[in-house]
Regions:
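A short hydrophobic beta-strand segment most commonly corresponding to one strand
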Residues: 24-27, 71, 85-102
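Short, conserved beta-strand element in jelly-roll/cupin
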Residues: 21, 26-30, 39-55, 93
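Conserved short histidine dyad/triad with adjacent acidic residue
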Residues: 8-13, 25-40, 74
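A generic "binding-loop/recognition-motif" signal
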Residues: 33, 41-42, 60, 76-77, ...
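Short beta-strand His + acidic residue motifs that chelate non-heme Fe in jelly-roll/DSBH
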Residues: 36-37, 55-56, 72, 78-85
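A short, N-terminal "cap"/entry segment at the start of jelly-roll beta-barrel domains
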Residues: 1-22, 105-116
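Short acidic-glycine-tyrosine-enriched beta hairpin
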Residues: 59-74
């Protein structure tokens, strides 16, 4: 878990599968945790599986919960804070795939983590 109270699991990506243009993740944010505001070139969608929070995209912040799907345009600053009492889980998909080196900064593969 990162200091912000979020754990991200890399699912399909060019690094882990034969996907060439897509990166998918499952993220878990503990109560009070947050994904800090950041931006990247790929477009992205978040699909909230459970829990509730505050999603910021650009200058707009909205309350999100189970079943909500949020589109994040390319280059748009965004982040998600779990301000509820329960764990927040979401699935994300980004396309095109992240630029070379981006994934290595964020996710260590299990074999790399075991040898580090």
């Amino acid at each position: 878990m990162r200091p912000e109270g979020i754990t991200s699991y890399l699912l399909a990506s060019p690094r882990t599968s034969s996907a060439e243009h897509l990166t998918t993740t499952l993220a878990v944010i503990q109560p009070g945790g947050e994904q800090r505001i950041h931006s990247h070139r790929p477009e992205q969608v978040y699909f909230i599986l459970e829990g509730r929070g505050l999603m910021t995209v650009g200058s707009e912040t909205q309350r999100v919960g189970p079943g909500d799907c949020i589109f994040i345009p390319s280059g748009q600053p965004h982040g998600l804070k779990n301000d509820g009492p329960l764990t927040l889980r979401y699935f994300s998909a980004a396309a095109s795939a992240y630029e070379p080196g981006h994934l290595e900064k964020t996710w260590a593969l299990k074999s790399e983590a075991e040898t580090a």
